[in-house]
């Protein structure tokens, strides 16, 4: 079966509905949001020190968007407060990865000043809701051994380790309703 494709649709004909919680919404990232996304990346120096060994490059946001641009199964979002103001975080998710019906969170990151405020739990719940409405069955992600805080976060909101990759990377999964 060949599915019609248009703007916002992927190779499977999937267009995600809005991802919006009580306080924050996901806005599809484009060139207009590069500065805000870069500020979010730079606003999480501890994450980059642990995972990359240093701060993000000055063009990290532009590279993130360029990498995602050619992949119709990938979505990058700026996480923006409903009350207004600059982005507080970034969401990078692959649809139908590694197989149909599975989505993979490549990055959920918030400025350090915005961590611990419940935005991560709220954003994940909104993402799960959008995915379920599109027929996804599973949400998956990977966490490196150098990031125990992220591991604890994902476990707190119902994700379970289902496997290991090279270099101590744990794969987590949550079955969606």
Which ranges hold each PLM region?
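Glycine-rich phosphate-binding loop
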Residues: 118
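Residues forming the Rossmann-fold NAD(P)(H) cofactor-binding site
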Residues: 121
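Conserved acetyl-CoA-binding loop of GNAT-fold acetyltransferases
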Residues: 155-164
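Conserved GNAT acetyl-CoA-binding A-motif
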Residues: 132-142
């Amino acid at each position: 079966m060949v599915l019609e494709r248009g703007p916002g649709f992927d190779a499977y004909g999937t267009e995600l509905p809005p991802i919006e919680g009580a306080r924050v919404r996901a806005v599809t990232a484009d060139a207009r949001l590069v500065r805000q996304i870069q500020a979010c990346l730079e606003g999480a120096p501890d994450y980059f020190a642990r995972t990359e060994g240093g701060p993000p490059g000055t063009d990290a946001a532009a590279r993130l968007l360029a990498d995602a641009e050619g992949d119709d199964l990938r979505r990058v979002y700026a996480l923006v407060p409903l009350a207004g103001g600059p982005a507080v975080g970034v969401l990078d998710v692959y649809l139908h990865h590694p197989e149909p019906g599975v989505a993979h969170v490549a990055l959920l990151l918030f400025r350090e000043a915005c961590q611990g405020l419940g935005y991560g739990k709220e954003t994940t719940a909104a993402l799960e809701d959008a995915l379920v409405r599109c027929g996804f069955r599973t949400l998956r992600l990977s966490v490196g051994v150098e990031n125990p805080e992220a591991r604890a976060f994902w476990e707190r909101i119902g994700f379970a380790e289902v496997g290991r990759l090279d270099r101590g990377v744990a794969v987590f999964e949550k079955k969606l309703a």
